[in-house]
């Protein structure tokens, strides 16, 4: 009982009223926007960067010390001076600063506690490529997988309640509601796609944080329930009192499962279950039977609806057999393939031939999706035939070659872990020929003329970077094997998916 209570209990020291006061500190805005450091991909906003200065920050803090500029009325929001077009910069600055501040208690909890004891947490590499070695190691031994689209829309108030689990700072929560009021109607709903489109240039850090904290909240409880199948069988719901209304929801879940399955949660016992998530998509893979996966499916549906008040339809969760279906995940088509092999065994004067089959985890480049992305960006037509890029025709020859080369190297870098390199060579072919057509269009010549003029140097522009990296992995004297190396290489320095590879 105490063990379960300790898992869900929040440390009171992290619930002090300290977040709101930080919004009045000048250094917060410098840290929030990486002023003087390399900016992150979530904070790229050229227009805002030009307007940033400590003088503007001082004026902003002065205004906040004065009369209530943060009061927002639903009836006169258009007349509010603080939200006017001239004052919109202040609102954006506060929201970016607040996004940085609200991350502080979450970051500190992952590093250490006030008593100096380290919090046990699984260490994971930052690279998104680190997921694939895990899949190769685990999924090849499993049978079924739940292909899950994380439910949305999410009501704004649910996002605020998620933060309430971690901090009791009422002032900060009111400020959070202020920003949610500002950008959307309170009765509206936010979806994952709307996050990307609506907040692509403004306050992306804040709303990504809200969504990720919401997902992290249900993941923490989901993983806890998965790891405690036998404890939950006889545990009184009061053990979950520390989470707001969680104990009531647990009682409801117990009744639901008792009614439908005549058991509680112990039928989820499975030591070979694994969970992986990226953005709005997740997978639950198991070595069990299809019946077990059906139980997990309807458990998740009830879990989201009863605890998070999020409507989730069963059709958003697909049960697939790994040997018969491919997973569309992080711009790869992944599947488990049976790889037959013949082994000859010699024992004294007799020899035996044994047919052996090993499951291997394949990762393929999705040709159809890639052709669609290339056609959308005008590198090829809808049939996959390379075409010129007219919008780049006004650039210098070196800039054109450099742009195509960087895209080619970036995609080659990302898809280096593909099981079959043929699709990767197709990508290079499209970019190389599109580059040649763009140069020919600029100089009003033919493609053949430019290919003859550029020759091998043009090829090196697209392959040199890959060979340079492979030279660090393969022996120095195996130049041929470096150039035509067909093995899988997962680079652990990739933090985001290239736009052309991201089809989700």
Swiss-Prot record:
GO cellular component annotations of the record: chloroplast
Subcellular location: Plastid, Chloroplast
Top-level taxonomic group: Eukaryota
Keywords, in A-Z order: Chloroplast, mRNA processing, Plastid, RNA-binding, tRNA processing
Keyword RNA-binding applies: yes
Pfam families associated with the record: Intron_maturas2, MatK_N
Any one GO BP annotation for this protein: mRNA processing
Chief localisation class: plastid
GO molecular function annotations of the record: RNA binding
DNA damage recorded as keyword: no
Cross-referenced InterPro entries: Domain_X (IPR024937), Maturase_MatK (IPR002866), Maturase_MatK_N (IPR024942)
General function of this protein: Usually encoded in the trnK tRNA gene intron. Probably assists in splicing its own and other chloroplast group II introns.
Family indicated by similarity: Belongs to the intron maturase 2 family. MatK subfamily.
PANTHER family tied to this protein: MATURASE K
Name the record gives this protein: Maturase K
Lineage: Eukaryota, Viridiplantae, Streptophyta, Embryophyta, Tracheophyta
Gene that encodes it: matK
């Amino acid at each position: 009982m105490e063990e379960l209570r300790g898992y869900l209990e929040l440390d009171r020291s992290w619930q002090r009223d300290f977040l709101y006061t930080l919004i009045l500190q000048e250094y917060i805005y410098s840290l929030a926007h990486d002023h003087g450091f390399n900016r992150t991909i979530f904070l790229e906003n050229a227009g805002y960067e030009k307007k940033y200065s400590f003088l503007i920050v001082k004026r902003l803090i002065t205004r906040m010390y004065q009369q209530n500029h943060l009061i927002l009325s639903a009836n006169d929001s258009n007349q509010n001076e603080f939200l006017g077009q001239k004052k919109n910069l202040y609102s954006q600055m506060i929201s970016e600063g607040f996004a940085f501040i609200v991350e502080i208690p979450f970051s500190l909890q992952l590093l250490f506690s006030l008593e100096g004891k380290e919090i046990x947490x699984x260490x994971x590499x930052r690279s998104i490529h680190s997921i694939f070695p895990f899949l190769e190691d685990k999924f090849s031994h499993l049978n079924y997988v739940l292909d899950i689209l994380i439910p949305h829309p999410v009501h704004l108030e649910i996002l605020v309640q998620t933060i309430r689990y971690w901090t009791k700072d009422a002032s900060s929560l009111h400020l959070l509601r202020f920003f949610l009021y500002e950008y959307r109607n309170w009765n509206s709903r936010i979806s994952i796609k709307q996050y990307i489109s609506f907040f692509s240039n403004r306050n992306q850090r804040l709303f990504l944080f809200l969504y990720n904290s919401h997902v992290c909240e249900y993941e923490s409880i989901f993983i806890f329930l998965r790891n405690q199948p036998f404890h939950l069988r006889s545990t009184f719901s009061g053990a979950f009192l520390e989470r707001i209304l969680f104990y009531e929801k647990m009682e409801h879940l117990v009744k639901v499962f008792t009614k439908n399955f005549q058991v509680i949660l112990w039928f989820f016992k499975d030591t070979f279950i694994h969970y992986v998530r990226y953005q709005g998509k997740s997978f639950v893979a198991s070595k069990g039977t299809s019946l077990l996966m059906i139980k997990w499916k309807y458990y998740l549906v009830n879990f989201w609806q009863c605890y998070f008040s999020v409507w989730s339809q069963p059709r958003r969760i697909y049960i697939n057999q790994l040997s018969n279906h491919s997973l569309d995940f992080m711009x790869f088509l992944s599947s488990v393939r049976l790889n037959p092999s013949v082994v000859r065994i010699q024992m004294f004067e007799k020899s035996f031939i044994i047919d052996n089959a090993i499951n291997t985890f394949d990762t393929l480049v999705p040709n159809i999706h890639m052709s669609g992305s290339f056609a959308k960006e005008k590198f090829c037509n809808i049939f996959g035939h390379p075409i010129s890029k007219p919008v780049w025709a006004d650039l210098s020859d070196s800039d054109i070659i450099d742009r195509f080369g960087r895209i080619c190297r970036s995609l080659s870098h990302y898809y280096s872990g593909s099981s079959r390199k043929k699709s990767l060579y197709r990508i290079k072919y499209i970019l190389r020929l599109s580059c040649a057509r763009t140069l020919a269009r600029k100089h009003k010549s033919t493609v053949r003329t430019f290919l003859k003029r550029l020759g091998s140097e043009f090829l090196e522009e697209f392959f040199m970077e890959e060979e340079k990296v492979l030279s660090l992995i393969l022996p120095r004297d195996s130049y041929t094997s470096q150039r035509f190396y067909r093995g899988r290489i997962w680079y652990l320095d990739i933090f985001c998916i290239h736009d052309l590879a991201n089809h989700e």
